[in-house]
């Protein structure tokens, strides 16, 4: 066999840089009620590998919404996690989470307020 065949067969692991997770109070409150430490670690590990996995929230200046399984439910009926990835600071802010059946989507005013909070942190 040719050497090039062996090179194609080798799969290198993806290198993940260090990332700091910052949990805001609304997220902490949700997590304490609905998730174990293992659930949080699963979310963090997922975001380390796929930090841009959630849908961008229109008008949210980079805020993202991720569907995530909660309390034995699948993603569709589970939780929504609102987060922000601050690329240059290598941080992911876990801002807010809610169970889909208990709350509707965020209002425009809430989105604007959260976007401003993240902008202030970036600028300050």
Where are the language model's segments positioned?
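Arg/Lys-rich, positively charged N-terminal/basic patches that mediate binding to nucleic acids
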Residues: 1-38
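Residues that form generic nucleotide/phosphate-binding pockets
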Residues: 30, 46, 114-117
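Compact soluble domain cores
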Residues: 26, 35-55
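Alpha-helix C-capping/helix-to-loop hinge sites
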Residues: 30-34, 50, 98-102
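Charged, alpha-helix-enriched surfaces in structured cytosolic catalytic cores
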Residues: 22, 38, 77, 90, ...
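Basic/aromatic recognition patch in beta-strand/loop cores that engages polyanionic ligands
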Residues: 54-97, 102
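A generic structural signal for short beta-strands and their flanking turns/coil linkers
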Residues: 23, 43, 60-64
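Enriched for short, Lys/Arg-rich terminal
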Residues: 7-8, 85-124
